[in-house]
Amino acid sequence: MRGLKSNKPKPRIQKVSVRKFRRKVLSLSQILSRLRQKRNQKIEQQKRNKPIKPLIPPKTLVIVLKEKPEKTLYNRRYIDYKHSGLLQRYIGLGGKILPRRQTRLTAKQQRFVAKTIKTARVMGLLPFVSKERSFFK
């Protein structure tokens, strides 16, 4: 059977440009790097949409035996009474502390922010009452 040729006419294949159907063969490292780039782009878009969530510093001192490389904190900042710029985000126009539904913080973070705002007010870093903008017009 191998030596016999069939008399069936062969279908004609039209030549199509090679550029359209040329596939790129990617190595595993190239595929992984593309996946990382896509994931990083998604993370960046999510960071732009989310408000900055502050970190609560630890209460106790921890003895560090080994020095670990510091992890970069992109979207987070430590809450401290000295960071008046960060605390002013959580104060309304009249000088009142904004509620949780506006700040979108957890209950623990909201309590800590309120406590640090009160501390900063006592220290004189933040005002107790601020006049609304309509007052100056």
From Swiss-Prot:
Q: Which family does it belong to?
A: Belongs to the bacterial ribosomal protein bS18 family.
Name under which the protein is recorded: Small ribosomal subunit protein bS18c
Tell me where the transmembrane regions lie. Answer: none
UniProt subcellular location? Plastid, Chloroplast
Q: Quote the cellular component terms of the Gene Ontology held in the record.
A: chloroplast; mitochondrial small ribosomal subunit
Any one Gene Ontology molecular-function term assigned to this protein's record: small ribosomal subunit rRNA binding
> Could you confirm whether the keyword Repeat appears in this record?
no
Q: Which InterPro entries match?
A: Ribosomal_bS18 (IPR001648), Ribosomal_bS18_sf (IPR036870)
- Any Pfam family from its record, for instance, is Ribosomal_S18
Q: Which UniProt keywords apply?
A: Chloroplast, Plastid, Ribonucleoprotein, Ribosomal protein, RNA-binding, rRNA-binding
Predominant subcellular localization, coarse grouping: plastid
**GO terms of biological process kind:** translation
State the organism's lineage: Eukaryota, Viridiplantae, Chlorophyta, core chlorophytes, Chlorophyceae
> SUPFAM superfamilies recorded for this chain?
Ribosomal protein S18
Presence of the UniProt keyword rRNA processing in the record: no
Q: How does it assemble?
A: Part of the 30S ribosomal subunit.
